[in-house]
Amino acid sequence: MRTKKRTKEMLPIFDQKKVAFIGAGSMAEGMISGIVRANKIPKQNICVTNRSNTERLAELELQYGIKGASPNQICIEDMDVLILAMKPKDAESALSSLKTRIQPHQLILSVLAGITTSFIEQSLLNQQPVVRVMPNTSSMIGASATAIALGKYVSEDLQKLAEALLGCMGEVYTIQENQMDIFTGIAGSGPAYFYYLMEFIEKTGEEAGLDKQLSRSIGAQTLLGAAKMLMETGEQPEVLRDNITSPNGTTAAGLQALKKSGGGEAISQAIKHAAKRSKEISDDIEKTAAPLSGVIK
């Protein structure tokens, strides 16, 4: 996978940009949390809307200090960035209602699973700049691995704006749109794999006499340390693994048990199955979008 990563230090100034989230689910909340934590956009410049759940909007407004309002109360035309975060099944109707209000200069960020930039471009017309986005749940604490795929009409300046905004939530990787499924398998679903691993680390430590919370803390710090070693040393994972694996030592015994139990293959299969399911979801959406069949992949 060829990627381009832009670090936080390279991000441009936002200069009072206004951002609107169309959709107020868990994905939108994770992104809102990450952006608010980064403190690069004034809270009053961030708003969120949905079709009818005013209680949810009030909850987000209270929690994050942003503006929650119905679609009719938000001046869509004044926004610089619109983030499409509704459910994919609602995308066609939402885009239909938005297309008369969206302005040609506005940047559209889509976190709609399975829906391509082409679908949105053809739905909105006007050669709208669209960026497809795949964050993960760690966006909530500013530690997401987020992929972006650029539509046909995204200028260099708008790409920088997208990277800057999403960089508030963690690291940003620019990939080809046909790589989104495998990215989803690795990064979109990836946090769950590590939480699953942590369940067993915690349980095993507790069974051996450690306090449950202590076992969790030890395991989490170990995962964090290993991740930092990979990112800061630049070494290959097998090199770092070999460096701490002495012949007939404790690590060798543990790795042997992992291999015997199919640990490595299990990880590979988890990623492949998640990527396959991502593709299946995309295909299902294509079948239901008969008027624009062929533009969702």
From Swiss-Prot:
Which pathway or pathways does this protein act in? Amino-acid biosynthesis; L-proline biosynthesis; L-proline from L-glutamate 5-semialdehyde: step 1/1
Naming one, the record's GO cellular component terms include: cytoplasm
GO biological process terms, semicolon-separated: L-proline biosynthetic process
Checking InterPro entries in the record gives:
6-PGluconate_DH-like_C_sf, NAD(P)-bd_dom_sf, P5C_Rdtase_cat_N, P5CR-like_CS, P5CR_dimer, Pyrroline-COOH_reductase
Compartments in which it is found = Cytoplasm
E.C. no: 1.5.1.2
- Its chief place of residence is cytoplasm
* Superkingdom of the source species: Bacteria
> Would the keyword Amino-acid biosynthesis turn up in this protein's UniProt record?
yes
Is Secreted one of the keywords UniProt gives this record? no
- Per the UniProt record, one Pfam family is F420_oxidored
Give one GO molecular function term.
Answer: pyrroline-5-carboxylate reductase activity
Q: Looking at its record, which EC class is this enzyme?
A: oxidoreductase
Known catalysed reaction(s)? Answer: L-proline + NADP(+) = (S)-1-pyrroline-5-carboxylate + NADPH + 2 H(+); L-proline + NAD(+) = (S)-1-pyrroline-5-carboxylate + NADH + 2 H(+)
What role is this protein assigned?
A: Catalyzes the reduction of 1-pyrroline-5-carboxylate (PCA) to L-proline.
The family note in this entry says: Belongs to the pyrroline-5-carboxylate reductase family.
The identity of this protein, by name, is: Pyrroline-5-carboxylate reductase 1
| Species in which this protein is naturally found | Bacillus spizizenii (strain ATCC 23059 / NRRL B-14472 / W23)
